[in-house]
C-alpha cells in the first residue's frame, strides 16, 4: 500500500506523524510526505521521500495577514486561535497546498492519505482521487466551533474542485489517530466515532537529525534539572529566553535551554554556571535527565508527560493557550 502523509511545514506538525509513518514502513508499506518545499529537506533527512506542496509557515502567515487583517491583529490568546487560525489554515494554507497536492496525488497514486489535523488540503485531494484519509492529532482536539469555522471557510475550495466534504471539511470522516493522553484530551473526543487512541512508543524528534547528547549532561551536579524550550516557531525572541533564564539563574538547579536549530547561544550573553545553552538537542535524549520542563506548550508536552515530568507552560501563540489550560485542569502543570 502507498501512503501519502501531509503536514504543515514545521516540526510540531511533522514529528507527531513520524512514528506512524515509520510503523507503516516497517509493515512493508511505501510512505512519502508532502509539505512546503522549505521543509522538504527535514523530511528527507528523516529518511522519507518528500514532495513539495504549499507555502512556508512565514509565507502562510503573511498571506493570512493580508487576507484577514482584523483577525490577525488580535492579541495572542484563545480568541485569535479560534478565529484567525482556522481561516488561515482553510482560507489561505489549504488552497495554496491543494494546487500542488492534487497533481502529486494524481501522479504518485497513494492508496491512503494521513494528515496532521491542521493540514486541511489532504481531504480535498483524497476526495478528488477517491481514496480514504486519516487525520492525526497534534496535541489537543480542536474546539468544535473552530473546526466548523474551518469547514465553512474550506467550502469555497471544495466547490472549486467539485467535492463536498461537509461542515467539518472532511475531518474525522474515516479515521482520527489520537495520541493525546485521555486525562489531558478534550471531552469532545467522545463525539468522534472514528477516533482511535494511540500511544507513540517511538521517539519522534529523532526526525530532526542525528544529534548526540552533549557529554556534559551526564556530568551535571546531583540536583534538580530544569529544561527550557520555546519550541521551533516562537523561539526567535531572545528576550523571552532571557526572562526565563533570569528567573532560574539564582536557583539551586541545573538549567538546560535549547534555543532552536541554527541559534547561537552566544547571543544570550554570559550565563551563570548552572545554565547550559544549546542550539538543538533531541528531547528524547534529554528526557531521562530532566525533573521539570518549562515549555511554550506545543507538542513537547506529550513526551514530557509520558515521562511524568511536571510542566510550567508559558504559552506564546497558536494552540498553546488551550494546551496550557488543559495541563492546569489535569493537574500536570502550571501556567505562567
Predicted feature descriptions by range:
Residues 5-18, 235-238:
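A short, glycine/small-residue-rich beta-strand->loop->alpha-helix junction that serves as a flexible
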Residues 1-8, 19-32, 45-47, 143, ...:
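Nucleotide-activated sugar donor-binding and catalytic core shared by glycosyltransferases
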Residues 36, 40, 152-225, 230-235, ...:
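A nucleotide-sugar donor-handling region in carbohydrate enzymes
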Residues 30-36, 255-260:
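Short internal beta-strands
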Residues 107-109, 172, 288-289:
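Alpha-helix C-terminal capping/helix-to-coil transition sites in glycosyltransferase folds
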Amino acid at each position: 500500500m502507498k501512503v501519502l502523509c501531509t503536514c504543515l511545514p514545521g516540526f510540531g506538525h511533522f514529528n507527531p506523524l513520524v512514528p506512524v509513518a515509520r510503523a507503516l514502513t516497517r509493515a512493508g508499506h511505501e510512505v512519502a510526505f508532502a509539505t512546503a518545499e522549505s521543509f522538504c529537506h527535514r523530511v528527507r533527512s528523516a529518511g522519507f521521500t518528500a514532495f513539495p506542496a504549499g507555502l512556508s509557515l512565514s509565507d502562510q502567515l503573511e498571506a493570512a495577514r493580508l487576507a484577514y487583517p482584523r483577525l490577525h491583529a488580535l492579541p495572542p490568546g484563545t480568541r485569535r486561535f479560534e478565529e484567525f487560525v482556522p481561516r488561515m489554515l482553510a482560507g489561505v494554507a489549504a488552497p495554496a497546498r491543494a494546487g500542488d497536492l492534487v497533481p502529486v496525488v494524481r501522479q504518485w497514486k497513494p492508496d491512503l492519505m494521513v494528515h496532521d489535523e491542521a493540514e486541511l488540503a489532504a481531504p480535498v485531494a483524497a476526495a478528488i482521487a477517491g481514496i480514504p484519509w486519516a487525520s492525526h492529532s497534534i496535541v489537543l482536539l480542536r474546539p468544535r466551533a473552530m473546526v466548523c469555522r474551518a469547514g465553512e471557510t474550506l467550502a469555497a475550495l471544495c466547490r472549486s474542485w467539485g467535492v463536498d466534504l461537509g461542515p467539518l471539511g472532511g475531518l474525522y470522516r474515516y479515521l482520527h489517530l489520537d495520541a493525546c493522553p485521555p486525562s489531558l484530551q478534550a471531552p469532545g473526543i467522545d463525539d468522534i466515532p472514528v477516533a482511535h487512541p494511540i500511544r507513540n512508543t517511538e521517539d519522534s524528534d529523532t526526525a530532526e537529525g542525528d544529534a548526540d547528547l552533549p557529554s556534559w549532561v551526564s556530568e551535571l551536579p546531583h540536583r534538580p534539572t530544569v529544561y527550557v524550550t520555546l519550541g521551533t516557531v516562537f523561539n526567535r525572541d531572545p528576550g523571552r529566553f532571557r526572562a526565563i533564564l533570569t528567573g532560574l539563574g539564582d536557583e539551586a538547579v541545573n538549567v538546560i535551554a535549547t534555543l532552536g536549530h541554527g541559534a547561537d547561544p552566544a547571543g544570550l550573553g554570559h550565563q551563570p554556571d548552572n545554565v547550559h545553552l544549546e542550539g538543538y538537542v533531541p528531547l528524547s535524549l534529554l528526557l531521562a535527565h530532566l525533573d521539570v520542563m518549562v515549555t511554550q506548550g506545543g507538542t513537547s508536552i506529550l513526551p514530557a508527560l509520558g515521562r511524568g515530568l511536571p510542566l510550567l507552560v508559558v504559552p506564546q501563540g497558536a494552540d498553546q493557550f488551550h494546551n496550557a489550560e488543559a495541563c492546569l485542569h489535569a493537574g500536570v502543570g502550571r501556567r505562567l
